[in-house]
Amino acid sequence: MEDPLSSYKLIKDLRSGGEGKAILYEKDGVKYVGKKRLFDNLKDANQGLKEAMSLARIVHPNTVRFEDAIMTQIGDQIEITIMMEFCEMGDLLDFLIELSEPQHHHTVTLGSELSSLNLGSEYTGSDIDSTTSRTSSSSSTNFEAALLLENNNNNTIQHSHSSSSLVNGTTSPTNATTPPITTTTPNNRHSISTPTLAGTTTATTASPSSPSSPSSPSSPSSPSSPLSPQQHPVTSPQRKSSKSERKKKCSLKERKCIVKMTVDLTKKIFKKDNSNHTTAATTTTTTNTTHSSSSSSNLNIEEHVIHSNEIKKGVDSIYLIEQTQLIEWLLDLSYGVQALHRASMIHRDLKSENIFISGSNKLKIGDFGLAIQSAHHTGSIHSETVGTYCYSSPEILNSTYDKTTDIFSLGCIFYELITLKLLSHNRIYLGEDMLNDRFDSMQFLSTFPEKYEKLAPLVLSMISKNPTFRPSIESIIETLQKMDTSLLKERVVIKRENTIKGIRKQLDKSHFQEASLLLATSFVKDPRFFNIFPPSDPHSIPHLQHLYKYILKVLSSYNCSIWGYFAIDGTMVSCFVWLNPEKKKEIRLSDCIKGSLSLVTKIGLKRVGLILDLMRFDDNILSMAQNNNNNPNTSTSNLQTFKGSSSSSSSSCNHWFLAYCCTSEIFRGNGIGSHMIENVLNWADHNGVETRTVVFENNSIEFFQHHGFEVGSEFKSNLPKGVNKVMVLVRKPKQIY
């Protein structure tokens, strides 16, 4: 019988691993990767054919294309060769390793100590173990990292990260003395076992120059995990190469995938020289610098684009993937996952090592060895722990998962592409940290470059501990498609002086006229009011002002905390209204009656009737926030129609509730919102009580997430016309030391 492989011309071996090897073939001028595996019996071989079946089911531009599956008898064993598309640019992990800065090989918890790794602390290149190899495979790029680290051994590099909200947009360095924190796997092993190409393991230990360095957990990924066949030939070093040898190897390696990169300006321009001024030589060599003619003498710095093959890799990388290329890649990955899910497949091992780059720089999902059919399952699928530890969701670590676990892993890859910080190199284990209540969402958000902070809430939602709160792949695609990449182009304005000076103080009745106008102007486009006070109606703002003036009077009788911020000329530019702890959050029937009588002559009987319905709806919202029901499918019909919170226990009232907040449009982006909210948040932390609020649109979430709020509940049914959903946001009190 003719050998089925005879029609393919063998080019070279690409990689060998614990489960087999990958070989490059050519047929009719087209190159293919053959993934070879040996099995002892037919039953095991049939299991091995699952990957071929999974590949054959998916035909999509963003998944690796299946070509053929060949089964051959070799003695007592069965060999299966799966032929698939060859992606000549290699895998995404190798590409990211080439671009990313060498990191401390420390275990990291995304808590308050996260920034001690490389986000704001000083460190020297000599502290890094240059012998550590990448998890699941070895790569010659490690020699590049080791060489560059040796060249920088005597240089102290200082990094900074954003610790700002969307409101103030400032940058501050992290405390350089913060010690790194150690985490361990459930087995509490203190060394990292890295599978080599031969299937054996090598131990990675902390650098001798850093005796206090925490040890790293052992990765559950076994040497027999499915092979990533698209990678190029590499050699696992048996000894430390000399500096000259490594230099020679580095010079022979060329970057094959070339994409546009952009300068991370917020990191670049805030580097200071010894005199505490912005280093002029640094900014002018990479950006266009102009001085504004305004009185504040602002410094405007425009974005600069460079190709990835022009970048000299160093320990203080200032480059990010250019915004258009980044969004294209994020969409490539999303389209690939969408194709899987539409075919009722769960990949279960999404990671940057299993993402391949085609000749046209398109990303393709591959390695379907752990993919599983989900069409005949309802609810969660119960199985053994699978996947790769750094990218594993909390539920997959608990062996219970569904399609949403792919969303979690996809969020991890998004994080690596956006930040160029590799999870495995930084020892970041998101799923483990969430299971052990060590994950700090605020610290996670602060690791994003300010240039791409608009993407941070999306990624945070994708890695939500609760799978129910993760967005669908369709929702992710819609968000990315609607994103205007021009808004991600960076233009940094350094304010030479603070142009906003004012005072924050509590309001009394004499301020309600001005506060109500500010609220009316800010909330005229609130979806709750679309049908009552259309934004296009010139009378809507005056009518809303009457309504808010009455609301402020009522809330003041409840002893609520009403705060305003006044600019230097005495104009009120911000207003925050808080319902205090220990007070029932409800709208009383008597207030509704008084309100309808006082407003009927000002806004008309019909609108008063609609407002009464709205008050009932608002009362249900207070009940939602008070009970903090964590079932996102709960609707207002399941709550009490009126005075919904009156039956709640007194303990459920013990939280601050932000009822209204607004800042005049021309004063936004100057940190006023953060200044207004921080006093109550500090009180809440001191007293150990929660803070809650409610939002009706996704674009309102970002500000609150930057201040530690998370989505506690979401409601989508039985809502007033114009309101698509209601989200209750909850902020847990931070521990004060």
From Swiss-Prot:
The keyword ATP-binding applies. The keyword Transferase applies. It is an enzyme of class 2 (transferase). Residues 168-229 have a biased composition (Low complexity). Residues 156-167 have a biased composition (Polar residues). InterPro entries: Acyl_CoA_acyltransferase (IPR016181), GNAT_dom (IPR000182), Kinase-like_dom_sf (IPR011009), NEK_Ser/Thr_kinase (IPR050660), Prot_kinase_dom (IPR000719), Ser/Thr_kinase_AS (IPR008271). Residues 155-251, 278-298 are annotated as: Disordered. GO terms for molecular function: acyltransferase activity, transferring groups other than amino-acyl groups; ATP binding; eukaryotic translation initiation factor 2alpha kinase activity; protein serine kinase activity. ATP binds at residues 14-22, 36. The active site is at residue 349. This is Probable serine/threonine-protein kinase DDB_G0269628. It comes from Dictyostelium discoideum (Social amoeba). The lineage of its organism: Eukaryota, Amoebozoa, Evosea, Eumycetozoa, Dictyostelia.
